[in-house]
Each structure stands twice: as C-alpha cells, then as structure tokens.
C-alpha cells in the first residue's frame, strides 16, 4: 500500500502558491484494507475514504471508461492492481496529473512540470474529449492562472472545440454547469473564462445570448472598444479588479444581452435594449438554475443600468420609482450591488477605466435619504392602509427633492 499526494496540491506547491486542499491517492490497497485501518467510506460512485485523524480524502487508484453521454457517463474500476500512472492518466490536464510520494519526490509521467514551466494548459490524453465538463474546467483554470502567463495549448483548444461541436455539452446538468461557471467568475481573470469558451465554440452552446454580443458594434463616442462582447469582457475584468461578489459579476455578464437582438440596420444604436434583454436574462437564469439572489440582481441590472448612468439627470419621482423597484427599504444591499454593477459597466470601456463615477455616491445618498423617512409620524396622525402608503410615498418624494436640490448646490 503506497500513498501519494496528487493533483492541485502538487501543482500549487510547484507554482509557489498556497496549498489549501490536499487530495491523496492510495495504490495497492482494497476497500477492506482501508476500513481495517480506520478510514471512513464516503464515495458513492467510487471508493473514497476520510482519514481517521485529518479528515482528508483518500481515494483508491482507479481507471475509468466512457459508458454514456455527459459528465456522469463513466464506469469506474478500482482495485489494488491499478497503478499510479493509470490513475493519473484519467486526469484532465498534465499540470494536474502529477503526484508526490512520502519522501517529497514528484512523479510526473505526462510532462506536467514542463508545462508548468511553459505556462501551458495541456490535456493528458485523447480521453479528455470524453468528458464535456472539462471544457469548463480548462477555461476556469485559464481564468485562474492567466496572471501567471498560462494559456490553453492549441491542441487542447482543438479538443475543446471538438467537444463543443459534438453536442456533449448539452448533457451537462444545470447544477454542474453553474458550479463551474460560478467558480470561474470568481477567479482573478473571469473575462479569460468567457474568452476561452468563445474561442472554442462552447459559449455558443452554453450561453448563446452572450456569444451573440461578439461582433455587435456600439457607438464609439460612449464605447471606444466598440464591440459589445469585448465590452462585457472588460466589465468582468473590472469586477475582479474591484473584488465584486458573484451576484455582481453574474449581473455584469448578462447586463447587455438585449444588444444582441438589435437589427444590423439599427447599429450601432440599441434603443430599449434594457427591457428587450430581460426575457433573455430570465432564460439564462432558468437554464442554469441560478441562485435567487443572482437571478434577481441580473434581471434588475439588465433593466435599469442606464438609469444609473443617468442618475444625476433623473427627476425625483423617477428616482423614487427606481428605489421602489429594488425594494430598497427592506433590501438595501441589493441596491448597493446594483450601483456597483452599474459602475463596473461604466468602467469597462476602453480608456475610461479610471474615470470617476459620481452616479454611485449620488444614488447611494438618494437611497439613504429615502430610507431616512420615518413612518412613525404618519401613523401617529392616524393614517393607515392605502392612505398611509400614499402619504409615505409623498414624504419620500419630498426627501428626494430636497436631496437633489442640496446636491445641485454643492
């Protein structure tokens, strides 16, 4: 029985990065032997055990064979006869197919160290093309390590393109797809994730609404980058730079979907793209069963982001309607995230990344002014029901008028 550290822990140590999770593979052992040593079984599909002291995962060396469509279409075989090299060959990338023995020696049968040096994300074997989830995983690794100079090897990108064309991506479950997408959006360079999917044809299969934005022009006066797809990539880059949460990053990815519906005759203008994009945002949210907070923010940002850009020009009653659309009195954080997404949109323009966005402070101040209105004096007057609601609305409108006038003097 031999135990090896495998995968990400070996890769990250060699890259000089912090090692957080450690995976282990056990060669030459059976399930009965693991149980006899006090390991606790947890694997439903193949033999994985928890160490009795550390709680870390130890998996028996195994091989896998394609037996059906999709991520789950594999038959696994684990036995004491399976070698370390056989176990490593089923892994996705060479940089993830290295092991380390108990003396700290690296076992690298597929050239992972050379690819680390060359900054290449390269598949281990042609079996890579049997698992559609690997398209998303490789794009996610590209987003994680882009800052270190990593790129996807040309031959691996070709296999990813083959997978995209095969229709296998449609076999991915919404949950698995969302897990990879959400993790990728939180990487240091989420725009690289979308770019890689675009380059290999997978974006057209998974989120055709975003793919449709590439090649669609915008007015150069407002968008020096012109291409809407390029703009979305730049907005995601700003999200990472400003450490925005997942909900903001997801909303920014989808905020301009309506521009993909504009007829070429109307280019580069995109009249009413905000409202036209809402059904597309809803469709993408439903496709991946996106968490409710991300769904709601994406929908609201898509519909109202141009309101944010024009915030300083909005009349008090329009401003009040905007605040009420976000239920800012009970859910202030959602409005704050909307403002953040709108600012990322404004900054995601070529050459304008550092431009001030005074609309952010103005909108947050307006929300504070409206929320500061107390209902108590109105209740004490004996108002209730619809009458109370109307009086509260009038009081908030008055507060916003005063706020706008005060800001106008500043």
Swiss-Prot record:
Keywords for this protein: ATP-binding, Hydrolase, Magnesium, Metal-binding, Multifunctional enzyme, Nickel, Nucleotide-binding, Nucleotidyltransferase, RNA repair, RNA-binding, Transferase, tRNA processing
Cofactor: how and how many bound: Magnesium is required for nucleotidyltransferase activity.
List of residues binding ATP: 8, 11, 91, 137, 140
One MF term in the entry's GO annotations: magnesium ion binding
Record: residues binding CTP: 8, 11, 91, 137, 140
Record InterPro entries: CCA_bact (IPR012006), HD/PDEase_dom (IPR003607), HD_domain (IPR006674), NT_sf (IPR043519), PolA_pol_head_dom (IPR002646), PolyA_RNA-bd (IPR032828), tRNA_CCA-adding_enzyme (IPR050124)
Pfam family, any one: PolyA_pol_RNAbd
Binding-site list for Mg(2+): 21, 23
CDD domains per UniProt: HDc, NT_ClassII-CCAase
Keyword Disulfide bond (UniProt): no
Catalytic reaction equation(s): a tRNA precursor + 2 CTP + ATP = a tRNA with a 3' CCA end + 3 diphosphate; a tRNA with a 3' CCA end + 2 CTP + ATP = a tRNA with a 3' CCACCA end + 3 diphosphate
Documented EC number(s): 2.7.7.72, 3.1.3.-, 3.1.4.-
Highest taxon above the source species: Bacteria
Cofactor names: Mg(2+); Ni(2+)
Biological process according to GO: RNA repair; tRNA 3'-terminal CCA addition
Subunit structure: Monomer. Can also form homodimers and oligomers.
Family annotation (HAMAP family): CCA_bact_type1, CCA_bact_type2
Domain notes: Comprises two domains: an N-terminal domain containing the nucleotidyltransferase activity and a C-terminal HD domain associated with both phosphodiesterase and phosphatase activities.
Further comment found in the protein's record: A single active site specifically recognizes both ATP and CTP and is responsible for their addition.
Annotated family: Belongs to the tRNA nucleotidyltransferase/poly(A) polymerase family. Bacterial CCA-adding enzyme type 1 subfamily.
Role played: Catalyzes the addition and repair of the essential 3'-terminal CCA sequence in tRNAs without using a nucleic acid template. Adds these three nucleotides in the order of C, C, and A to the tRNA nucleotide-73, using CTP and ATP as substrates and producing inorganic pyrophosphate. tRNA 3'-terminal CCA addition is required both for tRNA processing and repair. Also involved in tRNA surveillance by mediating tandem CCA addition to generate a CCACCA at the 3' terminus of unstable tRNAs. While stable tRNAs receive only 3'-terminal CCA, unstable tRNAs are marked with CCACCA and rapidly degraded.
Protein name: Multifunctional CCA protein
Organism: Pseudomonas aeruginosa (strain LESB58)
Encoding gene per record: cca
């Amino acid at each position: 029985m031999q135990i090896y550290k495998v995968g990400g822990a070996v890769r990250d140590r060699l890259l000089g990065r912090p090692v957080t999770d450690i995976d282990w593979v056990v060669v030459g052992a059976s399930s009965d032997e693991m149980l006899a040593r006090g390991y606790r079984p947890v694997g439903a599909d193949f033999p994985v055990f928890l160490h009795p002291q550390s709680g870390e995962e130890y998996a028996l060396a195994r091989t896998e064979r394609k037996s059906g469509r999709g991520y789950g279409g594999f038959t696994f075989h684990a036995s004491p006869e399976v070698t370390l090299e056989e176990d490593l060959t089923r892994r996705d990338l060479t940089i993830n197919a290295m092991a380390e023995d108990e003396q700290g020696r690296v076992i690298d049968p597929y050239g992972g160290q050379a690819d680390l040096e060359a900054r290449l994300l390269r598949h281990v074997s042609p079996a890579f093309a049997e698992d559609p989830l690997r398209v998303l995983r490789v794009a996610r690794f590209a987003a994680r390590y882009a800052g270190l100079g990593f790129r996807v090897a040309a031959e691996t990108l070709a296999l990813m393109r083959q997978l995209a064309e095969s229709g296998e991506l449609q076999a991915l479950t919404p949950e698995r797809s969302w897990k990879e997408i959400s993790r990728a959006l939180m990487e240091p360079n989420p725009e690289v994730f979308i770019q890689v999917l675009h380059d290999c044809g997978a974006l057209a299969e998974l989120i055709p609404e975003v793919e449709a934005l590439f090649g669609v022009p915008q007015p150069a006066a407002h968008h020096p980058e012109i291409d809407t797809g390029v703009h979305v990539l730049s907005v995601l880059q700003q999200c990472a730079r400003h450490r925005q949460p997942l909900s903001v990053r997801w909303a920014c990815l989808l905020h301009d979907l309506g521009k993909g519906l504009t007829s070429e005759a109307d280019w580069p203008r995109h009249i009413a793209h905000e409202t036209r994009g809402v059904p597309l945002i809803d469709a993408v949210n439903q496709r991946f069963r996106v968490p409710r907070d991300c769904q709601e923010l994406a929908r609201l940002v898509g519909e109202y982001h141009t309101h944010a850009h024009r915030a300083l020009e909005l009349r008090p009653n329009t401003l009040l309607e905007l605040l009420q659309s976000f239920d800012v009195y009970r859910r202030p954080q959602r409005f704050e995230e909307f403002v953040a997404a709108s600012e990322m949109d404004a900054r995601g323009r070529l050459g304008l990344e550092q431009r001030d966005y005074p609309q952010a402070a103005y909108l947050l101040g307006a929300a504070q002014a409206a929320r500061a209105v107390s209902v108590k004096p109105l209740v004490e007057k004996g108002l209730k029901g619809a009458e109370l609601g109307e009086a509260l609305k009038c009081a908030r409108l008055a507060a916003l008028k005063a706020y706008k006038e005060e800001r106008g003097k500043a």
